Amino acid sequence: MDQIRPAAVRKIPCVLMRGGTSRGPYFLERDLPADPAARDRVLLAATGSPHSLQVDGIGGGHALTSKVAIVAPASRPGADVDYLFAQVSVDRAFVDWSPNCGNMLSGVA
């Protein structure tokens, strides 16, 4: 009988936090791959996308619970932190970097 081997698992620290009406993982930028395609793959895996229920990740199967915040030390004077928001598609292997989310941002404060 063939033994099924799980995909490689990589530990990446994060905090699962609610910000306003949204919730999701908050990652430190330094803990994620610098390469955008690799970073997208990590976020898709972390949320369990693409799967309508996101059963293999920490996404909640809905756009409100498939959001990611990435935080880094400020890269410019006058700012406390750098914040990057990602909307992870629930049922497609797609990470949208164009929107913003004030709810997730409130969790950074």
Task: List where the protein language model places each region.
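A glycine-rich beta-to-alpha transition motif near the start of alpha/beta enzyme domains, typified by
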Residues: 1-109
